[in-house]
């Protein structure tokens, strides 16, 4: 079995592959040097096309994941897709996700709406509503004590124009003047025509955190802001309000604690927000459900 996914949504580490992932993993890095999309695509394809495996498990919607799935399909290997059927109209990932859904043979989806979409895209066989397995790692959280900290997790818009980026930064500068500190998690490797990545790299030092450290940092933050799916999927379960900026995640289901960016008014709303933190991506024991499905293959 090969599992293909980003090692941590928080730290934006190199894309990695884990072989024999049910407890006996071997990590293979796609590599920091592969910053250009065509190199990362090629490397992902090569890893899967040349390796020995029976089942490929992939999560989400990245172009590198599409390459891995393409290689598996060409080798007539079984593909299990997690988090299909979701929508992010402002990102290239939306098209990649749907393409992966068409090529996969087994689907573990996170929400009821995603289940219905995959049923339409892929047919009624082997579609399972499991919830988001990554949420199972969010447990044993300390008491929340916001400490004038903001988590910034922003990536280049791939279909939008980053028009909300400057207003967002203006709001954050105002908060810094009021004594808040900003923790930036670092961007991904998407094309960056607006120069957002260069600006952030010039003004912030990325905080390299494990996934657990990211969860704990978010737990004590006043809010999370940016355009990462983690603000929509993980933050409600962490119990922290989040602000969704721009168009990258447009169409993605969200709970009431996810606030759409609308200038400083949305900042004030997030700071004052105290609940509820309902999460449409949560199902009990999602990881166990996925593991049971994998064992049955």
Residue positions per predicted region:
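A donor-sugar binding/catalytic signature common to diverse glycosyltransferases
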Residues: 57-59, 66-70, 81-82, 107, ...
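N-terminal subdomain of nucleotide-sugar transferases
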Residues: 1-32
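Short acidic-hydrophobic, aromatic-tinged amphipathic segments that line or gate anion-handling sites
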Residues: 109, 128-130, 206-208, 258-264
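Short N-terminal targeting/anchoring amphipathic segment
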Residues: 48-63
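A nucleotide-sugar donor-handling region in carbohydrate enzymes
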Residues: 6, 13, 100-166
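A conserved, positively charged/aromatic
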Residues: 88-105, 218
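Donor-nucleotide binding loops and adjacent catalytic segments primarily
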Residues: 17-20, 33, 144-220
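Leloir-type glycosyltransferase catalytic cores
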Residues: 113, 257-297
């Amino acid at each position: 079995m090969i599992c293909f996914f980003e090692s941590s949504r928080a730290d934006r580490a190199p894309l990695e592959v884990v072989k024999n992932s049910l407890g006996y993993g071997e990590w293979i890095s796609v590599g920091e040097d592969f910053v250009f999309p065509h190199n990362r695509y090629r490397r992902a394809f090569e890893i899967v096309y040349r390796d020995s495996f029976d089942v490929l498990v992939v999560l989400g919607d990245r172009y590198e994941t599409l390459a891995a799935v393409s290689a598996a399909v060409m080798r007539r290997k079984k593909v299990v897709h997690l988090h299909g059927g979701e929508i992010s109209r402002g990102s290239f990932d939306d098209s990649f996700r749907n393409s992966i859904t068409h090529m996969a043979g087994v689907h573990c989806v996170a929400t009821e709406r995603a289940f219905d979409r995959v049923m339409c895209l892929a047919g009624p066989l082997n579609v399972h509503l499991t919830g988001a397995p990554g949420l199972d790692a969010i447990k044993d959280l300390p008491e929340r004590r916001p400490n004038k900290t903001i988590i910034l997790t922003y990536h280049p818009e791939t279909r939008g124009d980053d028009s909300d980026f400057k207003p967002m930064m203006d709001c954050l500068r105002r908060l810094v003047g009021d004594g808040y500190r900003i923790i930036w998690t670092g961007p991904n490797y998407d094309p960056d025509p607006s120069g957002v990545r260069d600006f952030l790299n010039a003004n912030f030092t990325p905080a390299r955190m494990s996934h657990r450290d990211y969860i704990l940092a978010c737990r004590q933050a006043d809010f999370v802001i940016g355009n990462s799916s983690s603000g929509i999927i993980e933050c409600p379960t962490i119990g922290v309000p989040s602000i969704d900026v721009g168009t990258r995640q447009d169409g993605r289901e969200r709970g009431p604690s996810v606030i759409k960016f609308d200038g400083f008014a949305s900042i004030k709303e997030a700071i004052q927000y105290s609940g509820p933190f309902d999460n449409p991506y949560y199902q009990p024991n999602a990881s166990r459900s996925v593991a049971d499905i994998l064992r049955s293959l």
